């Protein structure tokens, strides 16, 4: 999944990544 260019916490990104 691609995360939008928003100031999201690393945990969020990481989880999706």
From Swiss-Prot:
Where does the record place it? Secreted
Which UniProt keyword terms apply here? Neurotoxin, Secreted, Toxin
**A cellular component annotation (GO) from this entry:** extracellular region
Q: In which tissues is it expressed?
A: Expressed by the venom gland.
Instruction: Output one GO MF annotation.
Output: toxin activity
What is the top-level taxon of the source organism? Eukaryota
- Give the record's family classification: Belongs to the scolopendra toxin 8 family.
- For this entry, the protein name equals Scolopendra 7913.19 Da toxin
Q: Which organism is it from?
A: Scolopendra angulata (Barbados giant red centipede)
């Amino acid at each position: 999944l691609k995360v939008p260019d928003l100031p999201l916490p690393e945990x969020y990104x990481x989880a999706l990544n």
